[in-house]
Amino acid sequence: MGLPWYRVHTVVLNDPGRLISVHIMHTALVAGWAGSMALYELAVFDPSDPVLDPMWRQGMFVIPFMTRLGITNSWGGWSITGGTITNPGIWSYEGVAGAHIVFSGLCFLAAIWHWVYWDLEIFCDERTGKPSLDLPKIFGIHLFLSGLACFGFGAFHVTGLYGPGIWVSDPYGLTGKVQSVNPAWGVEGFDPFVPGGIASHHIAAGTLGILAGLFHLSVRPPQRLYKGLRMGNIETVLSSSIAAVFFAAFVVAGTMWYGSATTPIELFGPTRYQWDQGYFQQEIYRRVGAGLAENQSLSEAWSKIPEKLAFYDYIGNNPAKGGLFRAGSMDNGDGIAVGWLGHPIFRDKEGRELFVRRMPTFFETFPVVLVDGDGIVRADVPFRRAESKYSVEQVGVTVEFYGGELNGVSYSDPATVKKYARRAQLGEIFELDRATLKSDGVFRSSPRGWFTFGHASFALLFFFGHIWHGARTLFRDVFAGIDPDLDAQVEFGTFQKLGDPTTRRQVV
């Protein structure tokens, strides 16, 4: 036929058997990629430190998705939450990966079978003997089956009735684990951070899908609607399917970037807004304040801050700090976190406590400015020493650490004070190993950033694809150059697959 590359998919027009074949092959490729990627990630993943070197710091992409659905153990004897296990069972990370690869192989064979045996009786219209598909009926079948799967996931898997439950954590990502979830039927179910909404919405949407599927199986569309929406044309199916996919892609890009119960920070890393709003910093100060109210010393109060919470309050874990073309995991950027040095508290020679102004998300460099409790600038690291009034040396700034590895250690040497003031711009101070992975010191994004960018980009492309194919199917006769005043009744499109010039026509 000599088709140009952008028209090759016309070979499956008017050929239901091979249309099924290429879709099964597509499923084989997707499942095969997922299983292979899981095995690759398991080969390079280091589960030894779930606090300072979690999956999202290591750039894992498919492991978080398995984990949020209830997989936590490996045949290698480790658990994602730390510690060892002896009986991981079939549904370990490797078990899921293997199931995808086996499924991919079966789909590959099924695709070949359907390509060879394309001319099946089931695809033929018994009245004409020609291949045809009852698309409204197929829509009803698909709606019913997807509704069934949706209902089953919400009612059984998520609730733990027959399944493991899902990953649930506290608002600060400290206590996450897989557990069963009760459906939230009240207004709280609409809060995107309430896990119960996942169960209730799947049950509700699944029920609606089942009922809508049964409706479309039992009720035929009116003739005018059938013709108006071109329900007999497979390109209508393509257009509406693309619409469903791009809509879903936009939704998940939002839930990933802004955060929700479906994207826990323990699995995908914190969101940029948690840095922008000082979310973890406020919780840390609240806990320290509560400790001081119980007559604990500053050192005791800061020592009780979980290292995990302190690590979230570090700009290197902000997904918006990674550049668009900086490939690799976060560990390849600023290094592997080894330990929390503690919280630095700066004071001037008059004893005032000073706070380092933190770097906003979209800055690569930022002036080092120390302010007092009223927000008045008291010290800085000047650009021009000749005109400085507030330099660390002039103001006599000292620093003392509370909690962490340097607990109780203080420094008055200006060079050391300035070093820690610069590092305090980036949040809590951590010791980072940049030698092991030859990390270059340039921040990388987390899987949260990559997922969002990928899905938002493809959603935009698919949006244009929906418009393109929708317009093609609605205005096919116009695009084909058929004169609306034509006095011959043309059976258009029967042979568009092969471009057959012998289209039947009948003068009226």
UniProtKB/Swiss-Prot annotation:
Listed transmembrane segments: 21-36, 101-115, 140-156, 203-218, 237-252, 457-472
Pfam name, any one: PSII
Positions of disulphide bridges: none
Cofactor note (record): Binds multiple chlorophylls. PSII binds additional chlorophylls, carotenoids and specific lipids.
Single biological process term from Gene Ontology: photosynthetic electron transport in photosystem II
The keyword DNA damage is assigned to this record: no
Signal among keywords: no
Membrane topology: Multi-pass membrane protein
Subcellular location: Plastid, Chloroplast thylakoid membrane
SUPFAM superfamilies assigned: Photosystem II antenna protein-like
InterPro entries: PS_antenna-like, PS_II_antenna-like_sf, PSII_PsbB
Sorted UniProt keywords: Chlorophyll, Chloroplast, Chromophore, Membrane, Photosynthesis, Photosystem II, Plastid, Thylakoid, Transmembrane, Transmembrane helix
A single Gene Ontology CC term: chloroplast thylakoid membrane
A single GO molecular function term of this UniProt record: electron transporter, transferring electrons within the cyclic electron transport pathway of photosynthesis activity
Function (record text): One of the components of the core complex of photosystem II (PSII). It binds chlorophyll and helps catalyze the primary light-induced photochemical processes of PSII. PSII is a light-driven water:plastoquinone oxidoreductase, using light energy to abstract electrons from H(2)O, generating O(2) and a proton gradient subsequently used for ATP formation.
Protein family per UniProt: Belongs to the PsbB/PsbC family. PsbB subfamily.
Assembly and binders: PSII is composed of 1 copy each of membrane proteins PsbA, PsbB, PsbC, PsbD, PsbE, PsbF, PsbH, PsbI, PsbJ, PsbK, PsbL, PsbM, PsbT, PsbX, PsbY, PsbZ, Psb30/Ycf12, at least 3 peripheral proteins of the oxygen-evolving complex and a large number of cofactors. It forms dimeric complexes.
Protein name, UniProt field: Photosystem II CP47 reaction center protein
